[in-house]
């Protein structure tokens, strides 16, 4: 969609922010290629880094002082060095653009210590035409997916997962595939339920 807007003369200016930031932490003013999908680069008004888990952290004058009358929640979100932990996971390319990969609270942490972003796998599964919607989650200490597809498409979905697994590192491979013709359960906001 963004590429089409740019082709039709629209100028796209994207910002990454959240309620806990006054302003934004990342700014994307590029109008070209893959960078259109990026969250952006640090804007210079605050410091931005990724911690060891890949979580975006922001520090500076744009960060809130804390949650009103809730010091416990503040301490969980802002560390002793003043870094606000956003809960968003990202990767950074060689040009310094940040790309969202998922949410920290959704991470699947394997017994091996490896972290798997379900959103990353869901995006890959979304390339299968037979899949209407899906969710990836831990299922009995394995990575599994629940897929909404027509009954006659289940074999196509399972074949797609088999092929996808060949391209993934061993620890990211999907071991359990459950198919349902019924839409997957959602919360009141319309988001897929992970549990």
Question: Each predicted region: which residue ranges?
Answer:
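Conserved C-terminal "lid"/linker of ANL adenylate-forming enzymes
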Residues: 108, 135-137, 162-195
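Conserved ATP-binding/catalytic segment of the ANL
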Residues: 42, 46-51, 55-110, 115, ...
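Ser/Thr-glycine-rich phosphate-binding loops at phosphate-binding pockets of nucleotides
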Residues: 18-21, 86, 110-111, 187-189
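C-terminal boundary motif of the adenylate-forming
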Residues: 89, 127-151
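Hydrophobic C-terminal alpha-helix "anchor/cap" residues
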Residues: 124-126, 165
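Glycine-centered tight turns that cap/initiate beta-strands
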Residues: 73, 130-133, 173
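Short, conserved charged micro-motifs
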Residues: 152-159
